[in-house]
Every structure is written in structure tokens, then in C-alpha cells.
Amino acid sequence: LDFREKKRGVDMAELGVEKGLAKAEKYYNDYGKRANELKAEGKKIIGYISALGPVEVLTAAGAVPFRLKGNVDEAITKGDAYMETIVCPFVRNVFDSSIKGKFSFLDGMVLPHQCDSLDRTSDVWRDYLKLSYFHFLNVPHVTDDPSIEFMKELLQLLIKTLEDYTGNKISNDTLKQAISLHNENRRLMRELYGLRKNNPPLISGTEMMKVLVAVMGIPVNESSELIKAVIEEVKARKPAADNDKKRIMLIGDQIDSVSITDAIEGAGAYLVMDDISIGSKMYWQDVDEDKEPLLALSERYLRKLKIPTTFVDTGGTYEENLNARFGHMRKYIDEFKVNGTILFVYKYCDPYGFEVPAIKSYIESAGVPVLYLEDEYSTSSLARMKTRIEAFLEMIA
């Protein structure tokens, strides 16, 4: 398989005709439209739901990795008939969208062993979506050498099931090619993030959110072309004069809506960086192309990716342990000149709930104030959140 060739029916020059940000907004507003078109062209669309989605393997199989998302503006009307209301509201909302047929173009899904809300509902996803392909990836939660070996075996099993399903052989060469494509995609996204270091940033947090969501639902080659177009467009902007607006970093998990970014920037701040699942967590760590592919992938997803469900044991002091888990956040704070952070966690998200005290104290110990927000995956209480954000910005002014 040559992933660099132009896909059938896709004129990549089209991205040059329609500016990158306009294209991203179109994909954001009509999420899944491009995947639906590719499905009609005969492509296999394989869904995933978190930063643990092994996108390189899906690409190597000739499939289109498609990240599932919910709709914060839509109430859960069917999902609660299948899942308890104490299940993470994000998971319930995504399942609700799925059971309503929002992602009817999906051929299959890879669901990771990550949190209780995913682990304990995997049978529900399998039994009620009735996809022709479903794979539960039993990702370990520790990062020692035996876990890396176990992860390699899990990826080998995933490859076998994908080969059987798609009919495409996933060789080391095709896997390396897919890894290279996704690494280049990550590099481009980091370049775009870098344009937020300016004061004021050249791209807003809301524009960035639309780009992040847009690229989750298209093939990696199209994603890279879109990011290039956005970079070119944003670089052409004339930098505005410096001002004293506060520079905010958003921390959280499955945040994929402009409602929160609009609330932050509408209150008079710049959203300049994030540590969220669809954002920097997806793009900051590459797969080592000099190592054997399965080993490199295992190390990337277990050791390099910093998520609450992975236990990092340094064997050192408490401070060393905190640095191993959250040190990247301090680097972001320094690099992007962050004045304040907003830690936004969904109700019933136990992994992040347990991490909140440690994250909050770690960041505050660096002299950066933290606003902790806990809410549903919904815009129903947005007014209350806006009030708290405004008060926080006044406090740190």
C-alpha cells in the first residue's frame, strides 16, 4: 500500500483553493462528512475514541482512522437506555450519537482498556453497534519492560485481526511508512501550535479547536495537507500589538467543543496551550523511526503518552514522581508563557478526578494559578462556567 498517493476522488489542490481555516470549520461543523464520502468510495472506516487509538496500525491496514466524538449541544436520549448514568458523560454521549446513527459509516472500532467507563461498557459497544469489526485492545497500565513486551504482542494481535478483516497485509515496511506519515502529521501540528507563542497568538484557541477536531475525521495525508494550509494562512496574518490579556492553558481529557474555548476567550483571555486528549497529547510525542516498529509504537503509547490511566513509577521521591507525570505541563507553561491554567474535568471521570489534587498543587507550586471546573459533557451549564472563568481572570489580572 502506498499511503502517499492521491486518494481516489480527492483533489488535494482543493485545500489551496479553499483556505485552511474555512476547510477546518466546515469539517468541524459537519463532522464525519468526509468519512462518509470515503466510505462511499470503498474505504474502510475504523473508529477509535481516545489518545490510545493506534492510528498508525489502522493507516497501515489501508483503513481510515476516525475518532468518535459526541455532541455537547445534544441531550442523551437513547444512550441512557444502555448505560448507567454514573458512566462518564463523554462516553455516554458518544455512544448516544453512535446508537442514533451519527456514525453509520463506521465499519469497525478499536476500543482500548483505559478507564472503567470504557472497560465496563465494551460489550455494550460491541453488541449494540453491530459493527462488522470490533477489537478490544487490552492496553496495560504500567510501563515496565514486561508491559512493553505485552503491548507488542497486543499490537501483533491487532494487526492479525485487521489483516483478516481488510485483506491487506501489514508488513514492517507498510507499518514504517504509516509511522512516518503520522510523525510528519504530528510535526506539522506542533508547528501550528508554535504560532500560539506570539503575543497575541496568531491563531485563537477556538480556531485551533476547530482544526484539532477537523483532522480527527480525515485520513492522515489529508490531515497533513489541511494543517499545512492552515499554517500558511496563519503565518500570513499581521501580528497585532502586545497587550496584557492573560495567557491560559486548558488541561483536561476529552474536550472537543468550541464552547469552552469561546467561554475562555470571550472572557478576555488568550487560550495559548492545552494538555487535552485531542490536542497536545496526540501530537507532542513521535514514534521512534529508528527502532523496530512494534517496539517503537509500544514505547510511544505506554511511556511517552502521559495520561492518568498509565502508572509511572520512577522509584524515586514524590517530587520525582510528580515531575515524571506532569513535568511536561511545566514545560508548556514556560514555553507558551502561561499566566493561568483551567483544569476542566467531566463528572464521574475517575482517572482525572484522582489526579486533580496532584495536578493542581504541582502547577500552583510553579507560581501559576489554577481554576478547577467539573461539569457534564454538555453546554447546559455553560453560563455558570463562564461566570467562574470571568472571576478567575479578574483574580489573576
Q: Locations of the language-model features?
A:
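A short, acidic, amphipathic alpha-helical segment used as a generic capping/interface helix at domain edges
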Residues: 98, 320-337, 354-355
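A charged, amphipathic alpha-helical module
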Residues: 8-44, 152, 156, 160-286, ...
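Redox- and metal-dependent alpha/beta enzyme cores, enriched for Fe-S-associated oxidoreductases
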Residues: 51-52, 57-69, 252-329
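Short, charged, surface-exposed secondary-structure boundary motifs
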Residues: 74-83, 144-148, 280-287, 381-384
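Acidic/His-rich segments in extracytoplasmic proteins that coordinate ligands and/or metal ions
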Residues: 93-164
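Metallocofactor- and cofactor-centric catalytic cores in central/energy metabolism, strongly enriched
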Residues: 25-39, 45-56, 75-80, 87-92, ...
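Peripheral docking tails and interdomain loops at the edges
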Residues: 13-14, 357-397
